[in-house]
């Protein structure tokens, strides 16, 4: 898809005529097929209107733990490579009329191949319910799709293999570095993990773990009886804790705690969300179906930015 084609599509998606046609089609009401055709995908779905797409982006950020922490970028053309800088940003002082002397920096970038992983979800509703004149179908569908996508995305952002889904932070070779190895998680191990992360990444660092691990850490004390968890503001060593139940529990061979700057985890949106209405497939059951899909990739572009605790056997 070329940039010109994308711009033309975006312009059409912003028009009120397209918005009206899209939502009438979603409710199986008469609609302008020529208007809707402007947003039809090669899979027979239709892209969300511009305003609805903005709502979807906001809803996904609410539903996905990672979307609120990661760097989100857009790469909707067919290009499949990004360059990420892997050095300390360069700067220098110079006299008022002096010249800056910087290197060319060409060797400071790492090339990453970006894929287009397709994520889909099927929603089914009672026909009478979806045709109810009082139903806010736009917000209802957006909320349902975002809940489904958000849950599936986070699972991949943690454990994804990078083949048919994004590469997760716990990937053995392309994920976060191991900061601490332990056979029994202690107060000291958590402190060690914190300081295993370089100061520049600790500055915006956050913790990530599941509920079971969080419960354990809430009870963890040092030898003086001091809790490691600040129960007043839910922080550990002054840094906020984010619960993601796709993280593993404390067990042999697992990585139950991650800490670092999650802005170095990049989520690359390859195509916007589209919805296909299944008018006939579930008609005999008195239902109407919707298939929503999106294309994206994600990966940790600086492995030292996030570190994990590895529990040994």
Question: What role is predicted for each listed range?
Answer:
Residues 58, 84-85, 91-95, 102, ...:
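Short helix/loop capping segments that flank catalytic or ligand/cofactor-binding pockets
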Residues 101-196, 307-313:
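Alpha-helical scaffold segments that mediate packing/assembly in large oligomeric complexes
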């Amino acid at each position: 898809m070329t940039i010109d084609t994308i711009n033309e599509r975006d312009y059409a998606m912003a028009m009120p005529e397209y918005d009206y046609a899209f939502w009438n089609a979603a409710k199986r009401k008469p609609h302008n097929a020529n208007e809707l055709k402007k947003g039809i995908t090669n899979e027979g779905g239709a892209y969300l209107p511009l305003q609805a797409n903005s709502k979807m982006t906001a809803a996904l950020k609410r539903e996905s733990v990672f979307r609120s922490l990661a760097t989100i970028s857009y790469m909707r053309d067919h290009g499949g490579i990004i360059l990420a800088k892997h050095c300390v940003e360069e700067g220098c002082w110079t006299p008022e009329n002096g010249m800056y002397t910087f290197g060319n920096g060409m060797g400071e970038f790492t090339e990453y191949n970006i894929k287009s992983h397709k994520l889909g979800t099927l929603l089914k509703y009672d026909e009478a319910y979806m045709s109810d004149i009082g139903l806010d179908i736009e917000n209802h569908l957006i909320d349902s799709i975002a809940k489904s996508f958000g849950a599936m995305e986070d699972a991949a952002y943690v454990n994804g293999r990078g083949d048919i889904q994004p590469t997760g932070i716990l990937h053995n070779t392309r994920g976060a570095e191991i900061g601490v190895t332990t056979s029994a998680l202690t107060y000291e191990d958590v402190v060690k993990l914190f300081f295993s992360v370089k100061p520049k990444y600790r500055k915006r660092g956050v913790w990530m773990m599941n509920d079971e691990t969080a419960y354990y850490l809430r009870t963890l004390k040092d030898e003086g009886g001091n809790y490691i968890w600040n129960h007043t503001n839910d922080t550990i060593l002054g840094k906020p804790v984010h619960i993601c139940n796709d993280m593993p529990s404390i067990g042999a061979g697992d990585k139950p705690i991650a800490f670092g700057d999650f802005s170095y985890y990049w989520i690359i949106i390859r195509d916007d969300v589209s919805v296909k209405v299944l008018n006939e497939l579930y008609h005999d059951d008195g239902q109407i179906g919707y298939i929503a899909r999106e294309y994206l990739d994600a990966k940790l572009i600086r492995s030292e930015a996030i570190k994990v605790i590895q529990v040994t056997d």
